[in-house]
C-alpha cells in the first residue's frame, strides 16, 4: 500500500510485516491527487514463458513467439518457431487475447498487447502480464512505453541485461 503524509512524501506499508518505508526516490513523477501509486504486481499476475531446450520432447509441438516477434505495439508473426509444451507448461506459457507481453531482454521493456482471437505460447524472455481485474491494458502499455523512454526501466546484470520478474513486479504505476 502506497500513501502520502502531510509533507507530500510517499510511503509504502508492507502488509505482511507492518513495516513502513519512504519511497520518495522511486516516484517517477507527480500524479493527480485522486490517483494512487501501486506496484504493477498487485494488479497483474505475471510469469515468463518456456526456455528453449532441444532435448526436451515431452508434450506436443506448438508455435511460440520470442522477443524477435514482439515489437512496440505489434507482433511480427511471419516466422514462428515450434517447441514442445506439456499440458502443465501450456497453462503458464500461453498468452490469450488482452495479455500485455513485455520483453525481458534485448530491448528491455518493449511491449505489445496480444489482441488476436487465438492463443500463443511464449518463450522465457517474454513476460506475460494478465490483469487480476478488468482494466484498460492499453493504458499500462503506454506506461511501459513512457517508462522505457524516460529511462525508468532498464536492465540489471553484468553481461546480458534483463528485466527480472521481481523488478517487473515492483514497478510503480
Each PLM stretch: what is its role?
Residues 31, 91, 116-118:
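Short, conserved secondary-structure segments in the cores of folded domains
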Residues 102-103:
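A generic structural signal for residues embedded in beta-strands
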Residues 39-47, 55-58, 71-78, 97, ...:
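Basic, amphipathic alpha-helical recognition segments used for DNA target recognition
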Residues 65, 81-90:
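Short alpha-helix capping/helix-loop boundary micro-motifs
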Amino acid at each position: 500500500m502506497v500513501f502520502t503524509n502531510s509533507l507530500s512524501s510517499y510511503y509504502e506499508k508492507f502488509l505482511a510485516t507492518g513495516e513502513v518505508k519512504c519511497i520518495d526516490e522511486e516516484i517517477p513523477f507527480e500524479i493527480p491527487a485522486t490517483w494512487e501509486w501501486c506496484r504493477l504486481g498487485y494488479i497483474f499476475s505475471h510469469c515468463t514463458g518456456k526456455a528453449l531446450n532441444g532435448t526436451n520432447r515431452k508434450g506436443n509441438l506448438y508455435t511460440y513467439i520470442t522477443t524477435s516477434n514482439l515489437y512496440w505495439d505489434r507482433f511480427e508473426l511471419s516466422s514462428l518457431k515450434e517447441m514442445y509444451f506439456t499440458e502443465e507448461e501450456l497453462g503458464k506459457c500461453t498468452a490469450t487475447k488482452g495479455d500485455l507481453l513485455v520483453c525481458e531482454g534485448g530491448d528491455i521493456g518493449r511491449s505489445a498487447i496480444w489482441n488476436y482471437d487465438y492463443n500463443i505460447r511464449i518463450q522465457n524472455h517474454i513476460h506475460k502480464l494478465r490483469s487480476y481485474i478488468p482494466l484498460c491494458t492499453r493504458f499500462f502499455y503506454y506506461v511501459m512505453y513512457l517508462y522505457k523512454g524516460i529511462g525508468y526501466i532498464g536492465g540489471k546484470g553484468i553481461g546480458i541485461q534483463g528485466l527480472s520478474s521481481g523488478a517487473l513486479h515492483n514497478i510503480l504505476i
